[in-house]
Amino acid sequence: MKTETPSVKIVAITADEAGQRIDNFLRTQLKGVPKSMIYRILRKGEVRVNKKRIKPEYKLEAGDEVRIPPVRVAEREEEAVSPHLQKVAALADVILYEDDHILVLNKPSGTAVHGGSGLSFGVIEGLRALRPEARFLELVHRLDRDTSGVLLVAKKRSALRSLHEQLREKGMQKDYLALVRGQWQSHVKSVQAPLLKNILQSGERIVRVSQEGKPSETRFKVEERYAFATLVRCSPVTGRTHQIRVHTQYAGHPIAFDDRYGDREFDRQLTEAGTGLNRLFLHAAALKFTHPGTGEVMRIEAPMDDGLKRCLQKLRNAR
């Protein structure tokens, strides 16, 4: 292991950064530093605001000067870092839109939005490495690791607040494309089924339909039919964990290659049909929202990757 010792940093707090707690602010500034170390340097008085000691719950004000001490951060050896750097570089190729307020990318399948839980690399960590000069980069919403498509990132705290409010008030519209088993009935335009989240002993999250769960609704529209599968457009009205995956399963049409809620026989059919599919066929195709800076209504679309396109073409040819 190598260690890197950065120098003392003085940061002037902007109006956009004001209002947040100092401990949360330090977590954005000291990326990769454990929370325990952040609280230790606060407790020891190594972090100063306007040259004074402060408590972790102190709320920053515009114009505050924050002294951030040098913190030793262990880094992996170069051999271990290089695949990480390749992933960081690849993120630059999937950015769909960027301005001073937001960044939108087409997240690849298989990449987590956050590191952690045994994962060293996530989209947000990669973006921070790609944009080291950015003072603020935070996820507005999440996508499951195996789901690809539109992912929205805020570049200002004010933008994050605005976009989170849109999510709460259902002012943001998300459209997904999913390949499901069998013939989806055109009259089934909505699935309303309460969802309950459980944590298994392994730590794995599993969601099921239960009257004890939270109210959940997904709207559906048939996009294209094939011999033994249907491509459906899914628009979640609520935003529960694994919502689309569980609602399609509940409707009797699980998503292709869903290792948690899917159907192995359906996956085998797809393999034998020569589709080449080996990942969850769930793609966040479009996101509609109001721009937090300009007030303009935006709709950003993310194209499917080549693997999903090839799969659909193979199914069309087999009809």
Swiss-Prot record:
This is Ribosomal large subunit pseudouridine synthase C. Keywords: Isomerase, RNA-binding, rRNA processing. Residues 20-83 form the S4 RNA-binding domain. The keyword Iron-sulfur does not apply. The gene is rluC. GO terms for molecular function: 23S rRNA pseudouridine(955/2504/2580) synthase activity; RNA binding. The active site is at D144. CDD domains: PseudoU_synth_RluA_like (cd02869), S4 (cd00165). The keyword Chaperone does not apply. Pfam families: PseudoU_synth_2 (PF00849), S4 (PF01479). GO terms for biological process: enzyme-directed rRNA pseudouridine synthesis. Belongs to the pseudouridine synthase RluA family. It catalyses: uridine(955/2504/2580) in 23S rRNA = pseudouridine(955/2504/2580) in 23S rRNA. Responsible for synthesis of pseudouridine from uracil at positions 955, 2504 and 2580 in 23S ribosomal RNA. It comes from Escherichia coli O157:H7. InterPro entries: PsdUridine_synth_cat_dom_sf, PsdUridine_synth_RluA-like_CS, PsdUridine_synth_RluC/D, PsdUridine_synth_RsuA/RluA, RluA_PseudoU_synthase, S4_RNA-bd, S4_RNA-bd_sf.
